[in-house]
Amino acid sequence: MNKLASLLAAALLLAATVASAAQQMLDVRLVKLTGNGTVTPGLESVAAIIRRNLPYAGCTLVDQQGCVMPANATLAFKGGYAVTCKTLDGAVGVTIQKNRKLLLSTSVTLKDDTPVIIGGFDGGAKGAKHVFVLQKSP
């Protein structure tokens, strides 16, 4: 009986592990945009989008957090930023605060693994801006 119970427990643990591994994640990155051409490895596709649409060449990762989809989480970032993500009818509601002050509240639709870039907040250095990049990951 103990052997059967052990096998059953192992099977349940394996099923739970497989189920959680199959869950999609929401990756949220805080990125600093600057005039120079420095790009953090892994942000090349984001930098290409930025360069086509905005007068910035540099794209540096400041911080990165994530949560399980469907999203319902508040993520804390460096610099006093907090990003709340909630899945609503297929879209993701996003609220961004800095030091508890509301900066932005919007809704975005995430498709496949295409990054969605939101923000444009003061990045501290002359002309630098902070943006958040939201992207589904498998």
For each feature predicted by the language model, list its residue ranges.
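Outer membrane pore-forming secretion/assembly proteins and partners of Gram-negative envelopes
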Residues: 21-138
